[in-house]
Design a protein with these regions (language model features):
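Acidic, polar-rich low-complexity tracts and alpha-helical solenoid repeat scaffolds
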Residues: 1-161
Length: 161
């Protein structure tokens, strides 16, 4: 596991995949370690242009949105789908994530921001603005970038009318 973390920190993505595959073949991994390894492999796949492989790992991880890896993976999977013009699929992924819930407010907020992007892409500016306003009114943290992302997006939406 140490080799995986070192390779990831050095952005040696090929090595990350190789080490992750070896580690994942072991049956005695705890669920937490398995998630960390899968997440590292997904990140490595994504950074080497193997988005579909990354999406497979994110899909598996997103089944458990109670974990930080699962919550982030649910968001990353939907973002990947959105970026690849699978708008309806991204919306379904986000709805599943939102319905499941997560204790990780940051990633849930990012999901709502992406949902607003989906509505904007469809020309449903009012709905996008509603998502953003609701998120702005209800987001508990102020020590991250969510509020500034919301404000930027609201400003952009205001300029489109």
């Amino acid at each position: 596991l140490g080799m995986l973390r070192i390779a990831r920190n050095k952005r040696q993505y090929g090595e990350v995949v190789t080490v992750a595959d070896k580690l994942l073949s072991e049956s005695k991994l705890s669920p937490d370690l398995r998630q960390e390894i899968l997440f590292a492999r997904a990140d490595a796949y994504f950074h080497t242009g193997k988005g579909e492989n990354a999406a497979d790992d994110w899909r598996e991880l997103s089944k458990d949105t109670r974990s930080i890896y699962g919550a982030q993976s649910a968001y990353l999977l939907a973002q990947y789908q959105f970026d690849n013009k699978a708008i309806d699929t991204a919306e379904k992924t986000l709805n599943i994530f939102i319905d499941k819930g997560t204790p990780h407010n940051y990633w849930l907020a990012r999901a709502f921001l992406l949902m607003a992007d989906i509505y904007e892409k469809r020309g449903e500016t009012f709905q996008a603005r509603q998502y953003l306003q609701s998120l702005r009114n209800n987001y508990p943290a102020s020590d991250d970038d969510i509020i500034s992302r919301i404000d930027k997006k609201l400003s952009e939406l205001g300029q489109t009318e």
